[in-house]
């Protein structure tokens, strides 16, 4: 007899920042329980699908009881008796029929909330894998039509700035990528060792409290300027003995410091500053070019504001061969925005965040489009995470080639990296690590 859904329940749990988030349980007719929880971001793109929050004074307005109620009273009852392997049909049913809200960029989930729909979509995917009797990553690969499983290069966010940290640093993340490793296991070793060397370098230079960690496990020393962050990474990589094997990535999150006067304020964290560090998009582009010529930078994410298509296109055409230009706030994992960016040659890599778009099916579509355009793809956590490890399987199943889920520190970050270690072990001799081919690890599917 076919295995079907017998119940769908959601509850409010807490993310790694102590904010409420949604968790969903799907019970199947064979007694199996599939559970998934959704994350939430600090620097969010204005084009992301709606994350439904309660407002009011409870939990400082961040409660999710409405989203939970939407799962329990609207989504859940509508899925009873359905086949959990029908991911695409059920995602489309939730998004287009049960919710049905649309804006210029497509299905915006304004009625039920992307957090409500996604919790169920992720749990459905886990339930579907169970019914098929295969690991989650294989089920995801099958849903996408991908034949090649690949372990991603981890991009460890080891120095935090921007909206994630209380220092003066404008740029949000400085990452290390062990592209020279021969396996994911070795990449973890390299990443952890560089992280510990970085800790001692920072402690020596800035003092003990500079090694306190931020939301994603990285350090937030009192760095005065962005170049200093790059210099610290270069030193730590050298001390660990991995020069040439471990390279650098940045997430600038430039929308956070773009002003109405169309300038970028590199001193945005100092209130009422004199404006002396405001620069034009053109000047910022040249700053990135100078960074890329001085340091082993392979990836720059969100280098400009989410509506500054012009400078995105310029930077991509000028250094896009050598450095991948990643769209996060620009694209918000939205197939329609990906399409526009492909046409305008605005960037050449997608940051994949399932909770920006709100369903597994739409996420897969954004990835397939990106791959067909010859782009790179980086799977990503959010700054407010849970112990859920779905994105580890997603990254392998879609052969993204890259994943960023924080520093090798804090359990909600390690949960994903540890799951990738398990997957690599399970694949045994068939395991392939993306390594130097992290931008195009497989043929488009």
Swiss-Prot record:
Q: Which UniProt keywords apply?
A: Cytoplasm, Glycolysis, Lyase, Magnesium, Metal-binding
Biological processes, Gene Ontology terms? glycolytic process
As for subcellular location, the record says: Cytoplasm
Q: Which cofactor does it need?
A: Mg(2+)
A GO molecular-function descriptor: magnesium ion binding
The protein's matches in Pfam families, at most eight in alphabetical order, are given as:
Enolase_C, Enolase_N
Enzyme Commission number(s) of this protein: 4.2.1.11
Q: Which HAMAP family match?
A: Enolase (MF_00318)
Q: What is this protein called?
A: Enolase
> Which species is listed as the source?
Ricinus communis
